């Protein structure tokens, strides 16, 4: 475990930014009112594949899934695996619920709120994958403690991933990329960076769909970077 200063996302205990945007369409509100209660992560208790799905399965955890394209793609690709997606933004949750309905994804559970609240309730060594795709970069230096890639969260990721489990990160912000590489370098006793050549972090690996945000980033001339780390142990 790496010593970390108070003030990173594991100790701030608050979310920054909006939790909702434009008013939901009626069809979206219907999904929030009717489908979300059926598939949301309970507010209390241990969170496991068994507690959520009734049987043990490889468990995936996505932090800040945006509109849910990646979450839905992976869940559809791996129907015998279990997926938890966390997103505080109501409009993103509503869009993701549409993917769950349209793709008929019984292997997805959703948490509208702070991902770390749920992550703490998952037993150590229970996760096969953690995804953090295009997190808020918090570009100002004084806001660096708000970045999800910080020593506290990375220690938490390490405790929840099983040996051989994988942490996947995507960002189009060069500052966030360099910051993440620096933080992860402090955790080489917990994680192995899987890149062997520069191409390995310039293109997504197999089974990794480009989201709308990623496509927008490319159109606007920004290059997404893809990092994969394996849990050592």
Model regions: which residues?
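S-adenosyl-L-methionine
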Residues: 1-61, 69-78, 97-125
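Conserved beta-strand/loop positions that form the S-adenosyl-L-methionine
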Residues: 61-63, 86
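Conserved beta-strand signature within the Rossmann-like core of class I S-adenosyl-L-methionine
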Residues: 163-171
């Amino acid at each position: 475990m790496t010593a970390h200063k108070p003030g990173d996302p594991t100790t701030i205990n608050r979310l920054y930014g909006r939790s909702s945007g434009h008013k939901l369409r009626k069809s979206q509100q219907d999904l929030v009112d009717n489908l979300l209660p059926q598939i949301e992560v309970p507010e209390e208790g241990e969170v496991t594949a068994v507690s959520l799905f009734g049987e043990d399965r490889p468990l995936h955890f996505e932090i800040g899934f945006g509109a849910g394209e990646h979450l839905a793609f992976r869940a559809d690709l791996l129907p015998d695996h279990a997926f938890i997606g966390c997103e505080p933004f109501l409009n993103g949750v509503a869009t993701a619920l549409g993917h769950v309905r349209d793709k008929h994804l019984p292997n997805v559970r959703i948490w509208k709120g702070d991902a770390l609240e749920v992550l703490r309730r998952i037993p150590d060594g229970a996760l096969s994958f953690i995804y953090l795709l295009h997190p808020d970069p918090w570009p100002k230096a004084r806001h660096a403690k708000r970045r999800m890639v910080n020593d506290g969260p990375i220690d938490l990721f390490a405790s929840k991933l099983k040996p051989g489990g994988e942490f996947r990160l995507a960002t189009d912000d060069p500052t966030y990329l360099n910051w993440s590489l620096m933080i992860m370098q402090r955790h080489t006793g917990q994680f192995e960076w899987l890149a062997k050549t520069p191409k390995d972090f310039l293109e997504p690996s197999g089974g990794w769909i480009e989201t709308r945000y990623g496509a927008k980033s490319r159109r606007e001339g920004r290059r997404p970077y893809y990092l994969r780390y394996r849990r050592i142990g």
